[in-house]
From Swiss-Prot:
Protein name: Molybdenum import ATP-binding protein ModC
Keyword Cell cycle: no
Subcellular locations according to the entry: Cell inner membrane
Reactions accelerated catalytically: molybdate(out) + ATP + H2O = molybdate(in) + ADP + phosphate + H(+)
Protein species of origin: Pseudomonas aeruginosa (strain ATCC 15692 / DSM 22644 / CIP 104116 / JCM 14847 / LMG 12228 / 1C / PRS 101 / PAO1)
SUPFAM superfamilies to which the protein is assigned, alphabetical: MOP-like, P-loop containing nucleoside triphosphate hydrolases
Residue positions binding ATP: G33, H34, S35, G36, S37, G38, K39, S40
Bilayer topology annotation: Peripheral membrane protein
Oligomer status and interactors: The complex is composed of two ATP-binding proteins (ModC), two transmembrane proteins (ModB) and a solute-binding protein (ModA).
Length: 361
């Protein structure tokens, strides 16, 4: 059976973890929440490093823990890869020998990832004979990820793998994580404090608060939920994955078709082949509303939308409007004055003017 079934209950001094999740068996699921919400503890339970009094861990049909059957597979027998904030490479071994450490744990007939494939995916072929002290922080982390992949895991756990890197190094490593997502059919549980990382990498989002699941769902739907604290953040917005239809070389604009509709958006981007999927984020503060389409506007992206819901924010001046754009969620943060002037109400049809689009690549 495909899918991840995760259920834990364990009490700690001043904290209780109580998790009950059914997650997709492929793609990247992000565990997101404030410090102390239980993200890393959840990963440790999955790995068998924290034996919960009550628990179940089933990964695409393979059960590693089921307290009802008194079943507990030892951590070293669980087919998972674990990537931490620090690569934890063996300082006395070359990169090649560090990678061999992960590879030798798996019989040749059972290997799903080979050395050459892992090196190519992470772009580390030229580093194989170096010692760890001669690697940058980003290079060390890429080697650590490759070593985890070479254990041929059925599940990859990543506990804030970019937290110790500066912005430049993060920017260097994110494309490699996207390649893993695209080219390997290994489910990933990804812990992060960074909304930008989550928006760029995740397919599914789990929001944790005080050891419990506050929300779980596809990234686009969950970010658009106005009942969650994420919607009140200054950088609140939605993530959409469009399909490239064409490129205008005269203006350097890509045309993207929105999922499940004929609606299109244009973004400044280098040429991409038709059919290529491109993920982007639209922030609520960058969306304004109009009762009619203004074709004379400098704003390129104007979409017909329907009002779904209006909610108060934590400021006296603004409201948040949840919109439907051809089946795609959209958020707009506007003033209360504008709400009253436009006489907005659920079900109303109007136009969303998107002033800025952030391509997540």
């Amino acid at each position: 059976m495909d899918g991840l079934r995760l259920r834990f209950r364990r009490a700690y001094p001043g904290f209780e973890l109580d998790i009950d999740l059914a997650l997709p068996g492929r793609g990247v699921t992000a565990l997101f929440g404030h410090s102390g919400s239980g993200k890393s503890t959840c990963l440790r339970c999955i790995a068998g490093l924290e034996k919960a009094a009550e628990g179940e861990v089933t990964i695409n049909g393979e059960t590693w823990q089921d307290s009802r059957r008194n079943l507990f597979v030892a951590p070293h027998r669980r087919a998972l890869g674990y990537v931490f904030q620090d690569a934890n490479l063996f300082r006395h071994l070359t990169v090649r020998r560090n990678l061999a450490f992960g590879l030798k744990r798996i019989a040749a007939a059972e290997r799903r990832v080979e050395l050459e494939q892992a090196c190519a995916l992470l772009g580390i072929e030229h580093l194989l004979e170096r010692m760890p002290e001669r690697l940058s922080g980003g290079e060390q982390q890429r080697v650590g990820i490759a070593r985890a992949l070479l254990t041929s895991p059925r599940l990859l756990l990543m506990d804030e793998p970019l937290a110790s890197l500066d912005l430049k190094r993060k920017g260097e490593i994110l494309p490699y994580l996207e390649r893993l997502h695209e080219e390997l059919d290994i489910p990933v549980l990804y812990v992060s404090h960074s909304p930008d990382e989550v928006a760029r990498l995740a397919d599914h989002l789990v929001l944790l608060e005080n050891g419990k699941v506050r929300a779980s769902g596809p990234i686009g739907e969950t970010l658009a939920r106005v009942d969650l604290p994420l919607a009140l953040d200054d950088d609140a917005g939605v993530v959409i994955e469009g399909t490239v239809s064409d490129h205008d070389p005269a203006y350097g604009l890509l045309t993207l078709v929105l999922p499940g509709s004929a609606l299109q958006m244009r973004v400044a981007h280098a040429p991409l082949a038709p059919g290529k999927r491109l993920r982007f984020k639209v922030q609520a503060r960058d969306v304004s509303l109009n009762l009619r389409d203004d074709a004379q506007s400098s704003i390129l992206n104007r979409l017909p939308v329907r009002v779904l819901e209006l909610v108060d924010t934590d400021t006296a001046a603004h409201v948040l409007v949840r919109l439907d754009a051809g089946g795609n969620p959209l958020l707009a943060r506007i003033t209360r004055y504008s709400r009253d002037q436009l006489q907005l109400r659920p079900g109303q049809l109007l136009w969303a003017q998107i002033k800025s689009v952030a391509v997540l690549a």
